[in-house]
Structures are given as C-alpha cells and as structure tokens.
C-alpha cells in the first residue's frame, strides 16, 4: 500500500495557489497518503541550474511555500549533477554556493516548519560531501534525501550511503543498481529493486535499524548504462576524496 509519495518536481502542480495546494493535501489525507514536496537544482553555479522559477533563492522560497501549503514537512532539492563534479574547480565551489543559498532561506524554512532535504543527485555529491554541506548550512533546517541509485555514480556502495546519511535523512528515492566490469573500469546501470546487485536484505535491515520512520519511496529509472573508467589515470582527479576503503566496498 502506498502511504507516502515524493513529488520531486514543481511542474506536477496545476497551480501554486494556497487553496489548490490545500485541496490536494486534503485529498491525499483522505487516501492515507503523505505528500513530500520537491524540486530540482538550487545551486546557481551548477551546469543544470534553470531560471524557470527565478533565482536560486527565489526557487527555494517557492518550494518551501508549496511544501507548507501542501502539508509537507520536507522540501527536497539537489545541487546538480556529475557535470559539476567534473567541471573546472571541482564540486567544492558548487557546495560553497549551495550552502550560501540555503543560509538565505533559513528563516523561511524554520518559520514554515519545513526541512530542506538535499539529495545526493546524479553523481554530484558523495554522501560524505553531502554531510559536509548539511552541517555547514545547519542541521536544524537542512537534512538529506537518500538516493541509493545515485550512490553508485559517486563510486559508493548504497549500504555505505544509507549508513552515512541515515542520521540526516528525511526523504528518499530508492532503486537498485547493476555494476559490472568493463574494459576500462566498470559500468553501472540503475534497475528496479531486486534486479541489481545491492544486498537488499542487508539494505532493508539497516534501514529498519537506522531510520525506521523514514519512508522508503521507490524511484525506478533504467534503460542505460554509464561507464566509470577508473583504470584511466586522469579519471581520479574529480574523485580524489574517495577513499580506498570506500571504493573497495563499491567494487
């Protein structure tokens, strides 16, 4: 039975008017469903940032208002994607910008009773980097959205991602991944749960132990594989902070 759903994009709503969102929330409650509100990237220097909803700060303030009116105590968003990790200057410059944006909406989030849930998204942030971002911004109003599929795009075992982010997690988008050897390293393909190589018995057991009240919301994306040519020497520059221990657990 579905009892929780993450609307990860603002485009799902016909209107941002308070009355419309309140009616939608009322219908969800009748069905016993909790809605979590979300949007896309909120880092102004990210290659994937869009001005559709104004500046990064305006975008995030809109998300917080939507979350409040729809009855969501979560506002999911993300920094960007792997392209930002691979960009000149690396991911840290974008982390810095995202922290600045988050701090500018601190009062809005606290007044609304909403936790901004930053996701490890499309290879942008390793779980340890996301923790750094959350703690720099402030854990009283910023938390994490756990994405087990995106974990593999930062050379991380999803179990490690779960264990690291569980203390901060308020939302989730969960899927499996298949990882196999390639000529230059490995290839990764996201799959439906049970069709990849994640130890689901261990994963669900750890979930129950570490964050039993956190909804496990499935997000199925598949159909393509991405290669990580770690045997190439120049591959490692954007991943220089990935420890040998973490990488061995990924493999």
Regions found by a protein language model. Name each.
Residues 3-7, 33-40, 75-77, 116-118, ...:
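Hydrophobic faces of well-ordered beta-strands that scaffold small-molecule active sites
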Residues 127-142, 152-251:
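Histidine-acidic metal/acid-base catalytic patches
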